[in-house]
Structure formats: structure tokens, C-alpha cells
UniProtKB/Swiss-Prot annotation:
InterPro entries, per the entry: Fmt (IPR005794), Formyl_trans_C (IPR005793), Formyl_transf_N (IPR002376), Formyl_transf_N_sf (IPR036477), Formyl_transferase-like_C_sf (IPR011034), GART_AS (IPR001555), Met-tRNA-FMT_C (IPR044135), Met-tRNA-FMT_N (IPR041711)
Provenance organism: Lachnospira eligens (strain ATCC 27750 / DSM 3376 / VPI C15-48 / C15-B4) (Eubacterium eligens)
Source species taxonomy: Bacteria, Bacillati, Bacillota, Clostridia, Lachnospirales
Residue ranges crossing the lipid bilayer per the database entry: none
Designated name of the protein: Methionyl-tRNA formyltransferase
Binding, (6S)-5,6,7,8-tetrahydrofolate: 109-112
NCBIfam families: fmt
GO MF annotation terms: methionyl-tRNA formyltransferase activity
Length: 315
């Protein structure tokens, strides 16, 4: 097939590689404009652009994919299909309906659940048993197009947003190649989504990671995993941000009298861990990062910082 690929972040790179390796003709890659980064404000390529350049593929970077001039330029590539993976802009009907097989999107959830941004992190935060990848034929709605193929993935007990991201990126890559094969062979029957079963998730921001210890330890442990590596779960100690990278849940702590503790209070300090009271249960903290410092296990943190039972976190 003659393919135009539209994508921007790391998640999309694996799919682009898989399309190339499967022998499809990638006529062009469309990605977001280069972004200034760092103090020097030097322009940085998106991960997808890096991959396209490495393969000598033409790269297009429209400020607005809806602009008529870009739409007409895209038309000149005569694509059989446009593959869209985390591109970052909404597409007009003039692009969606342009190629013979339409625009095919790779979405990291089991649609119609978790439409929208950040479905990977939310699957972990919400404690889902399964996540997965859906390929769909795009329409003008937000992740509302007809379903083409689905692959489920069972989440591990200690799944993080980062580990699930990597797994679903790989799943999405091979599922998209299978989808292209099925479309070309005429063996796929698109299935309409059941809108009554749909859920939407919002984009994550750094502020979302602030831990509310009135919540249960189980909820907070999932938040920690879901926001690892970005934007990360955090609290404050003596006015400094303390990121919590790994923790376990404990229902009871034998040496603690429940009625004497408040949510957010450090209740035990051991050699290699410390424990925080929550609205329900306790968090046993295994790995942290104090503001301005590197990530470290809790034992290393406790050897370099004085922490005593009774200290309130979040202040």
C-alpha cells in the first residue's frame, strides 16, 4: 500500500517502523512542527521526524492540518491509506475522506472505553484488569470511528504508565500492520462503536500528581504507578517537593494505633522504607526523589535525610 503516516511522539515510532518493515510504500510522514527546547531554545525534532529522516522519507510539518494549502499538498501524495498515531491535531473531513481506505487510527484503549487523551495512564490509575489497542476508521468525532481490529493486554500487578506505554506501542505496531493486510484483502468488517458504553479521559497535567492522602492507599498506589514516569505523583516535605516513585499498600501496621494518626502522617520509619497513613490503609514507600536530587530507594533517602514518625506530608 501507498501510505502517508501522521504521528508525533515515541508511541508512534514503533508503528512507523513496522509499516516500513512490512514493505509498504511510505510516501510521506506528517508530524508536528519542531519545538524549541532548553535554555538555548534550539529546535528539536519529534521522535517520528527523527525516524522518518533516518529512512529518507519526506516530512511535512503543518502548523494547522486544516489549512487548505496543506490539504491540497497532502492530496498530491495519492495515498491509499493515511495512518494516524498520536498526531496531535484534529483532522478535517477533507483529509479523513481523502484516501481509498480512509484514515486509520491506532488508539491505546479498548474502545469505546477511554476515548480521548492519556488512556494508558488512566487504565493504570483506574485499576483496569485489561487495556489494549484498537484500530479504527476515523470519522470527525473524538475516537468515535468504526472499529477494525482489537487486541487486549492484561495489566501486570505492578504495571506503570511507562511499562504499559511500551507494551501497547509494540501491540499497536503489529496490529496496524495486520489491519492494513486485512483492509487490502477485504477481510475486515468495520464495527460501529456502542456510544452508550463510551467513557472519556482528560489530558493529564503536572498538578494532577499531587497526592491527597485522604484517599485510600490503594488509590494512591495506582496513581503512583499510573503517573510513572510522567507527570509523577508527589507530595511535599518541609516545603520541598517529594516525588514518590514506588510504594506498596498495607492494610494494617501492627505498631500503629489507628485512632492516633491522620492522613498524610508518617507513622513508621524503618531502615529501608517509611509508611504514610492514608484515608484507608497505609502506603509503604520504596522509592522517592527529593526536589533537586536524583531518584533513590527509600533506604538511601532515609540515610541522607532525617525523617521521624509523626511528620505530616503535603506541607
Amino acid at each position: 500500500m501507498r501510505v502517508v503516516f501522521m504521528g508525533t511522539p515515541d508511541f508512534a515510532v514503533g508503528t512507523l517502523k513496522a509499516i516500513i518493515e512490512a514493505g509498504h510504500d511510505v510516501a510521506a510522514v506528517v508530524t508536528q512542527p519542531d519545538k524549541p527546547r532548553g535554555r538555548s531554545k534550539s529546535l528539536v525534532f519529534s521522535p517520528v521526524k527523527d525516524e522518518a529522516v533516518a529512512h529518507g522519507i519526506t516530512v511535512l510539518q503543518p502548523e494547522r492540518a486544516r489549512d487548505e494549502a496543506f490539504v491540497e499538498e497532502l492530496r498530491t501524495y495519492n495515498a491509499d491509506v493515511i495512518v494516524v498515531v498520536a498526531f496531535g491535531q484534529l483532522l478535517p473531513a477533507s483529509i479523513i475522506n481523502m484516501p481509498r481506505y480512509g484514515c486509520i487510527n491506532v488508539h491505546a484503549s479498548l474502545l469505546p472505553k477511554y476515548r480521548g487523551a492519556s488512556p494508558i495512564q488512566w487504565a493504570v490509575i483506574d485499576g483496569c484488569e485489561y487495556s489494549g489497542v484498537t484500530t479504527m476508521k476515523m470519522d470527525e468525532g473524538l475516537d468515535t470511528g468504526d472499529i477494525l481490529m482489537v487486541e487486549k493486554v492484561k495489566l501486570d500487578a505492578k504495571e506503570t504508565g511507562g511499562s504499559l506505554f511500551d507494551r501497547l506501542s509494540d501491540v499497536g505496531a503489529h496490529l496496524l500492520v495486520k489491519t492494513l493486510e486485512g483492509l487490502e484483502a477485504g477481510t475486515i468488517t468495520p464495527v460501529k462503536q456502542d456510544d452508550s458504553e463510551s467513557t472519556y479521559v482528560k489530558m493529564l497535567h503536572k498538578s494532577f500528581g499531587k497526592m491527597d492522602f485522604n484517599k485510600s492507599a490503594a488509590e494512591l498506589e495506582r496513581l503512583i504507578r499510573g503517573l510513572n514516569p510522567w507527570p509523577s505523583a508527589f507530595t511535599y516535605i518541609d516545603g520541598k517537593m517529594l516525588k514518590i516513585w514506588d510504594a506498596d499498600v498495607a492494610d494494617n501496621i501492627s505498631e500503629v494505633q489507628t485512632e492516633e494518626v491522620k492522613p498524610g502522617q508518617v507513622v513508621t520509619v524503618g531502615k529501608n522504607t517509611f509508611t504514610i497513613a492514608c484515608g484507608q490503609g497505609y502506603l509503604v514507600v520504596n522509592e522517592v526523589q527529593l526536589e533537586g536530587k536524583k531518584r533513590m530507594d527509600s533506604g538511601s533517602f532515609l540515610r541522607g535525610n532525617q525523617l521521624e514518625a509523626g511528620v505530616m506530608l503535603g506541607e
